[in-house]
Amino acid sequence: MVEKTKGRKEEVVTREYTINLHKRLHGCTFKKKAPNAIKEIRKFAQKAMGTKDVRVDVKLNKQIWSRGIRSVPRRVRVRIARKRNDDEDAKEELYSLVTVAKIPAGTLKGLGPQIIEEDDE
């Protein structure tokens, strides 16, 4: 019999992504742009990490709302970490934590997804 190994969605991992909010919020009502941006970031993290439980960091929320409800940044660089849920009575075994990533000098162009080695922050 072949031994079952852990699936790729089961491992704890951290990745950096650039999310193009402009494309995801095109045609959205002005007064709903910032709330919808947060929803789109959650949706992106669910798809990328395969977890239903997504937690958005306060600093990321402040960055999205920094220019008001209408003027959301076109692109945002985020770090998504899939982590184990320590609560015993939690529904999901894993959750995703979305934080702001440090942007290298220059622009966001040409930066693809990157796997981050675990360094205890």
From Swiss-Prot:
UniProt xrefs under NCBIfam families: PRK01192.1-1
GO cellular component, one term: cytosolic large ribosomal subunit
Any one GO MF annotation of this record: structural constituent of ribosome
Assigned protein family: Belongs to the eukaryotic ribosomal protein eL31 family.
Keyword terms: Ribonucleoprotein, Ribosomal protein
GO terms classed as biological process: cytoplasmic translation
UniProt KW Cytoplasm keyword: no
Full protein name: Large ribosomal subunit protein eL31
InterPro entries named in the record: Ribosomal_eL31, Ribosomal_eL31_CS, Ribosomal_eL31_dom_sf
Species this protein is from: Panax ginseng
